[in-house]
Amino acid sequence: MKFIDEARIEVIAGDGGDGSASMRREKFVPFGGPDGGDGGRGGSVIAVADRNINTLIDYRYAKKHLARNGENGRGADCYGKGGDDITLRMPVGTTITDMETGELIADLTEHNQSVQIAQGGAGGLGNLHFKSSTNRAPRQKTDGKPGERRMVRLELKVLADVGLLGMPNAGKSTFISSVSNARPKIADYPFTTLAPNLGVVRVGPSRSFVIADIPGLIEGAAEGAGLGHQFLRHLQRTGLLLHIVDLAPFDESVDPVAEAKAIVNELRKYDELLYEKPRWLVLNKLDMVPEDEREARVSAFIEGFGWDGPVFEISALTGQGCENLCYAVFDYIAAHSDAQRAAEAEDLAADVRFRAKPADPVAADDSGVDPQQ
């Protein structure tokens, strides 16, 4: 199936039904009075996150989604039937934005999370609501309200703990296939990866994390060059970025330091927050470097790149160093997840809305004896 991570659709909620201006006409009831019922409400448009859906391809071709209108009210105090809601099922990780106002309507991050994105119109009032002591036979009634109509943009941002960065053919797909069950296409030409790939890395029982591989970046990606700029949004939810560098390029004229700096510059141009995410340096293809040259080549790269963060030396093809890297990544994610939960708990405790009310003092009766003793 083709991977589609963006779509634009129009959602139209149902209109409310009109109220009825009806009079009770019945034998032996000379002054029946008003009996017009209200109109039914219009159907709403609801978005639901579904973990069994992986792409927005259904919305690339179905551009308009309409809910049903409410029925009109009728006589004999009959209210109109409400319009049925429609449900749009989307992948977990989808954001929904109003294209006219720029408002973020919803961010679907959990399975079965539901959000109303277009509200149905309210039904009109029948004339039975307008009777009074001075107006026994009202002819007034109100029409139903129109439902909301919106043009929205759907964007899928995959949910992963770790994202892979690097130039084409740096070995990102080889790495993710080495440490997980993901099987992306691997070949010796650039842009083999055309869509994001997700893999689950297990480091022990109930100990795992999700890693995302996106198409390789090239210089100018933030301005539209290559493919990577289309998929950088998928790294925005990650907690850690692994910058994979090819230390042994086939073309000897290629400078790994210059390529690594180009990747960092593209991150900064695309999104400052993404640039500031924690980033580790992963030097790949060490099996292609003679053993007596490895230390010198690694030191020269780190010095030329001006890097002072964590560095890991691996060979994704042979698996050398991959296990230690995965354990380090899991420990980092687990530690930061615990810290985030603790911070959220502190924020919750500081919120006055959730503070426990102090117990009321126990009043003594006239005899001076505590009634609870």
From Swiss-Prot:
Gene Ontology CC annotations of this record: cytoplasm
Enzyme kind, highest EC tier: hydrolase
Cited Pfam families: GTP1_OBG, MMR_HSR1
Residues binding GTP, per UniProt: 166-173, 191-195, 213-216, 284-287, 315-317
Principal cellular location given in the protein's record: cytoplasm
Compartments it resides in: Cytoplasm
Gene Ontology molecular function terms on file: GTP binding; GTPase activity; magnesium ion binding
Binding site for Mg(2+): 173, 193
Every Obg domain range: 1-159
Cofactor: Mg(2+)
GO biological process, one term: ribosome biogenesis
Listed InterPro entries: G_OBG, GTP-bd, GTP-bd_Obg/CgtA, GTP1-OBG_CS, GTP1_OBG_dom, GTP1_OBG_dom_sf, OBG_GTPase, P-loop_NTPase
Ranges for domain OBG-type G: 160-334
E.C. code: 3.6.5.-
Positions of region (Disordered): 127-147
Keywords per UniProt: Cytoplasm, GTP-binding, Hydrolase, Magnesium, Metal-binding, Nucleotide-binding
Record keyword Hydrolase present: yes
Keyword Cell inner membrane: no
PANTHER family: DEVELOPMENTALLY REGULATED GTP-BINDING PROTEIN-RELATED, MITOCHONDRIAL RIBOSOME-ASSOCIATED GTPASE 2
Family as reported in the entry's similarity comment: Belongs to the TRAFAC class OBG-HflX-like GTPase superfamily. OBG GTPase family.
The protein's assembly and partners: Monomer.
HAMAP family from the UniProt entry: GTPase_Obg
Protein name, entry field: GTPase Obg
Organism: Paraburkholderia xenovorans (strain LB400)
Taxonomic placement: Bacteria, Pseudomonadati, Pseudomonadota, Betaproteobacteria, Burkholderiales
